[in-house]
């Protein structure tokens, strides 16, 4: 699994720990949406320093940079949830939405706020409608 924007790291103990941080955030979503598809995760280094994450639209694949994993838990959650929306629903950036803006600047969303915006995109997407049927809360 490769993308032009991020150079994948080879798997080792350190990369495994970084990947686990991302997977644990995906599990937060999975607790709300039990039918969330399996999302493939890679960790790497951005070829453009401003990139924190990349997703294949509607293809359930995300790449997260080491730089993003080194950020605070809330900042990493914002990046991961943003990429989940891309990967699962295919939605593009929305500069009016704090979760789906193209840049991570200004106000960071907390866990509840991230989930609120993520739910909005999943529940409003017809191809992800099956997920909303399994939503808890």
PLM features per residue range, with description:
Residues 74-75:
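Short, surface-exposed coil-to-beta transition loops
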Residues 4, 10-71, 91-137:
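Metalloprotease/metallohydrolase-associated module, dominated by Zn2+-dependent proteases
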């Amino acid at each position: 699994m490769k993308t032009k924007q991020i150079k994948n790291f080879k798997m080792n103990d350190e990369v495994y720990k970084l990947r686990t941080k991302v997977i644990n955030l995906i599990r937060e979503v999975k607790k709300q949406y039990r039918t969330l598809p399996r999302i493939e995760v890679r960790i790497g280094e951005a070829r453009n320093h401003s990139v924190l994450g990349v997703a294949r639209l509607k293809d359930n694949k995300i790449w997260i940079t080491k730089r993003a994993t080194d950020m605070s838990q809330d900042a990493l959650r914002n990046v991961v949830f943003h990429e989940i929306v891309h990967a699962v629903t295919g939605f593009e950036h929305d500069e009016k939405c704090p979760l789906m803006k193209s840049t991570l600047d200004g106000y960071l969303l907390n866990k509840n706020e991230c989930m609120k915006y993520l739910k909005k995109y999943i529940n409003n997407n017809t191809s992800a409608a099956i997920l909303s049927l399994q939503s808890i809360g």
